[in-house]
Each structure stands twice: as structure tokens, then as C-alpha cells.
Amino acid sequence: MVELQDKVAVVTGASSGIGASIAETLANQGVKVVLTGRDESRLAEVAKRIQDNKQAVVETSIVDVTHKEEVTELVEKTKEKFGQIDILVNSAGLMLSSAITEGDVEAWEAMIDVNIKGTLYTINAVLPSMLNQSSGHIINIASISGFEVTKKSTLYSASKAAVHSITQGLEKELAKTGVRVTSISPGMVDTPLSGDTDWGARKKLDPKDIAEAAIYALQQPSHVNVNEVTVRPV
């Protein structure tokens, strides 16, 4: 089991839901956490909640992952502050209900910008330093929707399928470098992103369930890469 104490993590989409829960769980393990998102007040609330419960090292940074220059600045400032980045969690995401036949191009572009480009921008920013230190772990939050498409989820599903493919390809590119990469594909999770979406008789997952999956992947021995995790409600 890998010890996470004093490692440095950047978590995108950390103002609520899965990102906030992963950040809090990492802090519980002694990880120094940089919370990023677009909502300053909600980020501050998450940071306060973490700091109230433990002696945690928590920083916040207002970042829009669709802006490459903001992502680059985030990574550089984090390295200046803490020396390195050991963990990147790509949790920033956007889910809009939009069928192709509706022709809502703005919704499509928004999901592509956040879910695909945002993921690529953060990976691109942290990867050189991770390769230089021969260690690091990138966790990308994908979705069951990347495999199971409904008539209203075509573009969202496509964007999350892309996240899955990016992770699978990156794992092959990073073989023997010491840098690991994991995609976590949750089923329906009780977060602001899912809203009032009907999931039938199944109970929604708690964001903590996804956080525990992330910790499991991170704590594996350095020669083990948990490349893909699927988490479904019972």
C-alpha cells in the first residue's frame, strides 16, 4: 500500500459533488490539496469544512479548465508552493441533456470544452513534471454514460467515452514511466450535476463511494496501475 501522507494533489471541480468528496478524503489521508473550480464561495466552504475537521493543508484556486492559460498558471503556482504535484484528479464536468436532433450546438460545445478539452489541458500541464520525477497519478472521472447511451445523453456520453479513451491510451503511453492513470466511471451519483435525473428503482451513489474508489487506486503498490474502475449502485 502506498502512503499518501504529504503528497500534493490538484483536484478540479472541487466545489461540490465528487470533486469535493475526493478532496476531503485525500485530506483525511494527509495529502496537501489544491481545490479548483469556478465558484469561489463554494470552494471556500469546502476548504473550511476540510480544515474544521482536521489539521489539513488546503489551498483554493479559481480556475476555468476550459482556459488553457489558467490551467498552466495553476500548475506552475502549485509547483512553486509545494515543489511538485503527485496527484491530479480531473473531476470538473458538465452534463446537459441534449439530443442531436435538438441542434443545441452551444450545449455540445460546452460539454466538449469542459469534459474533453479541460481534461486534456490539465493532463498536458502536469505531465511534464510527473515524467521528470518518474512518479505521479492522474485520475479522470468518466461515467457509465460513456458506455450506456440514452436518447438525451448522446453528446454527454460521447464526451465521457472520450475521457475513457484518453485514459486507456495514456496508460499505454506512460508504461514504465512511473506515472499511473486511472479512469473511474460512476453510475448515477447524488450530486448537483445529476440533479433530479430519474434512475429508476436504484438508489444513487454517494460521492464518498467514488472518493473511496479513487483512494483504492492511489494506494496500490507502485508497480500496480488500476487503470479502470466502474462503480454502480446496487
Swiss-Prot record:
EC number from the UniProt entry: 1.-.-.-
UniProt keyword terms in alphabetical order: Oxidoreductase
Family matches, as CDD domains: SDR_c
Active-site residues per Swiss-Prot or TrEMBL entry: 156 (proton acceptor)
Amino-acid positions noted as binding substrate in the UniProt annotation, renumbered to this chain: 143
UniProt binding sites for NADP(+): 10-34
GO molecular function: oxidoreductase activity
Enzyme superclass (EC): oxidoreductase
Family the UniProt entry places it in: Belongs to the short-chain dehydrogenases/reductases (SDR) family.
Protein name stated in the entry: Uncharacterized oxidoreductase SSP0419
